[in-house]
Amino acid sequence: MAFYDDSGADSQPFGRPQKPYEGGIVGPRRPRLVTDYGSSLVQWMRTRRPRYKGGHRMETERPSASYIVDMLPPLARIHSPVDTIPVRHLHQSIGKSKKPITVVRWTPEGRRLLTGGHTGEFMLWNGTAFNFETVMDAHYDQLQAGVTSLAWSHSHDWLISGGQKGDIKYWRPNFNNVETIDDAHHDAVRDLAWSPSDTKFLSASDDTTLKIFDFTSRTADTVLTGHNWDVKSCDWHPTKGLLVSGSKDHQVKFWDPRTARCLTTLHSHKNTVTATRFSRVNQNLLATSSRDQTARVFDLRMMRDICILRGHEKPVSSLTWHPIHSSLISTGSEDGSLYHYLLDEPNVPSGQIPTIAPYDSPDPANTPAQVIYPAHRVQYAHSATIWSLDWHPLGHILASGSKDNFTRFWSRARPGETSYMKDRFHIGEEAAEAQGTWSRGFGRRQMREEEEQELQDEAESLVDQRKPTGSVLPGIQIAPPGGTPHNDGLGSQLLPGIGAPQPPPAPSAGIPSSMPQMDPNRLAALLSTQGAPQPNSIPPNTGFPGFPMLPALSGTPPANVDLAELQKQLMSQGIPLPQNFAPQHFSPLPGTGGLPGLQGSNTPDNPYGR
């Protein structure tokens, strides 16, 4: 992947220029770092070949900066997981609330990262520039606030979230909350998993139970009981009717979702099981992590552990599989360390004897599990517990959420880059400062700059949310003459009839809106003898104000009167016609009906029939 370089930033003063009171001049901020995977994908799509022919026609990548243009996405290197290990720190993000991050999940298309924290809020981060996009209340409560679990459906149409008080909420991809199950559990919902068909989902809670919910009816079809303590993790096999759960009672249990029966129990761990995850690539493997400082990989066909992942000095708190490489596992610990394991490379420390894998043994059932050590260690990835890990769908960026309030992004190193081995995440802040690869003063200044950027991004997102949601047409948002625009940050006012309230009707100049009530028989007699009666507000034998009185017509007007001929007679006698005034009670032109100006119209082209 191609991205801007920020190496050497600690030794070169190219950060935010100092303010006047800091002894410097004011200038523009340094550009935000961007990770672009589009160019790598496009180049691979243009040069790829069938895998039996070598996969692609690009030149082999070498450790030189000139080969950055030849970087390939993980999908083009499925047989080389070592090239995908995320050893380089890309960016760190922190919310305005500065609270611990309990769960991180990439959106299905990979354009954004969704995080949930102790405040009960969802925070959305851009997946390319890593800037803040929006924040919203998700599981907020005055007594028990906090987002504890998130899960996207396989169809990418729904998101479910679990809260600290035991509630589960349904969300659309636009993060519109459409349903809430308030009494899903009696305690915090620690994990969620969808069935392969997306018709049901599984929840694990600290109330010692697991529940299978029907997504449509929002009711619990089955309650799985068998754990004796808090259930910390669960997962649903991607293709099989098989459930797995891990608990504080040190047990890993397999369940049949149809009969709610426990199939078997694994007792390999010696402390709380913190994560249980089926592999989406090799669906015969299950990975678990525990507070006993180890993680294990089980083979479902043998129903036993085949690998023990060692190396952590503190309890393992999180675990994730790579979405493309079946042999790459990443784990996070309570001391903030981030380790990456390759299942086909034991990486045994010097002085220790490597163990044989059960697959290579003539007696796999009785061969001890192979011990695997990390292929790479990021010892100081965070300063507190790493509670959640999640890979980008393309497999090139790993996101981590921690108790230290930070969300950090990690990726592979570029060709020829080795400076990352001396940064503060690998050797610590004191050692990095001693070697000159990190400056404590620059770190504080960079933190202030990032906080300012996040505040600015949040302010811009709030302005976007204040836009009117009614009927708005482009280019019709102006303030009326003499009026004052709404104070909505947009400085605009809708025109009447284009989404704004209609103006009051014009006055009727003293003409009553309706005639007084009269007996129909009497009205017919009056019309047949002396014409229509005058309104009370208009004296008889007088016209409307400003208009002359037309000569009275005796008798009843004929039904087929010619309006055009009548107009000619009035004009020949010198009687002026009032402008914009149509004589009432005139009969329509014969043989017309429809639209103005067309044959068969009931309405003439103008008020006088011309």
Curated annotation (Swiss-Prot):
Residues 601-610 have a biased composition (Polar residues). Pfam families: WD40. SMART domains: WD40. GO terms for cellular component: chromatin; mRNA cleavage and polyadenylation specificity factor complex. PROSITE patterns: WD_REPEATS_2, WD_REPEATS_REGION. It comes from the Eukaryota. Its main location: nucleus. It is found in: Nucleus. Residues 1-29, 480-519, 574-610 are annotated as: Disordered. Keywords: Chromosome partition, mRNA processing, Nucleus, Repeat, WD repeat. GO terms for biological process: chromosome segregation; co-transcriptional mRNA 3'-end processing, cleavage and polyadenylation pathway. Signal peptide: none annotated. InterPro entries: Pfs2-like, WD40/YVTN_repeat-like_dom_sf, WD40_repeat_dom_sf, WD40_rpt. The keyword Nucleotidyltransferase does not apply. WD repeats lie at residues 96-135, 142-182, 184-223, 226-265, 268-308, 311-351, 381-420. Required for 3'-end cleavage and polyadenylation of pre-mRNAs. Also involved in chromosome segregation where it has a role in chromosome attachment to the mitotic spindle. This is Polyadenylation factor subunit 2. The gene is pfs2.
